[in-house]
């Protein structure tokens, strides 16, 4: 009978369906399974591919109710349906009995992850770290040692579409952090387990937050507390002026009908100037700046008052000097202007042009000088050109009185009474041609 059982075990091909078996009957989930017994660094993985053939887990003599079995090298590989799609998060994933292992049987996480040995500092889990919260408000959860198997299986499985998504295996993405107090949080979403995954230098101090401590955001206007103003020293008056608003002025948050309007800001500016301790120099400059517009306005008002018709004299002084010539309406303010005007009526023209051939006479000397500059000092004109009257000529000499050459240049030493040699009597019209 014994030999017959051994022959049967030699020909036995074991097919394990963990979906039909409970978590206590699964060979990979029994308390007697130890990762140290496996000859490979990664024993049978829950996240392995379609079929899994472990070279050593079924060789253990106590893996199934203490019945010894011998492994055939030519037998069909052990097939199992250990797909994450068949394992629910609350059935096999969250209640794995790996946490019941002895302290000496547990190993550091980098020992199970040979591909991540360079990141030992990030994946090391201290053994003396507390596993649960000590606060009575937070529910108790299992220890963190069960994540050794989860992390080992998670990092060694390929990313395939048929397995459980990352949100179910990642403890930070499975459930929200804040839940109701009566609802029990799953093991993958506990704050204690997440703290074990954090590095030691970034781990936070565990704190318990009850729903009663969470206060809703105030919807009404918020006024600054009175204690914030009592903290400032009273002996320094400048601190009071630097506060953004006075205690009696409130600011509405979220409502357009707040008191912080442009009108209130304008009024607050005056309060700021009154409360601010100005230095004498600064105050004097401010006063001068405010006085300047008033001075300008007073000057403008004075000019407007002077231009008004009421301030003008009632009688305008008439021109005293009138021309006595019948039919002439000339009036002058000065006597000499009237005298010069009377010469035009008397036909007296004592001022005559000295240029030979030009005999024009003028009653006034200024008219004669204008005749010189406008008539004889320009080339190409109808009148004779005189070089002594041209300011641009090298022969310019306004005091010269004498004979001129046909081109208008002066003949020094000659007089106006002398006749010009070999020129005959020439008219002004001939010179112009």
Swiss-Prot record:
Domain of life the protein comes from: Eukaryota
Biological process annotations from GO: conidium formation; sporulation resulting in formation of a cellular spore
Keyword RNA-binding: no
Amino acid composition bias (Polar residues), ranges on this chain: 238-264
ZnF C2H2-type span: 321-345, 351-376
Matching Gene3D superfamilies: Classic Zinc Finger
Compositional bias (Low complexity): 30-48
Major subcellular site: nucleus
Upregulating conditions: A huge increase in expression is observed between the fourth and fifth day for solid and liquid cultures.
Keyword Repeat carried by entry: yes
Gene Ontology CC terms, in alphabetical order: chromatin; nucleus; transcription regulator complex
Disordered as annotated region, ranges: 23-54, 238-268, 391-423
GO MF, one annotated term: RNA polymerase II cis-regulatory region sequence-specific DNA binding
Subcellular location: Nucleus
Record keywords: Activator, Conidiation, DNA-binding, Metal-binding, Nucleus, Repeat, Sporulation, Transcription, Transcription regulation, Zinc, Zinc-finger
Name by which UniProt lists this protein: C2H2 type master regulator of conidiophore development brlA
Organism this protein belongs to: Penicillium camemberti (strain FM 013)
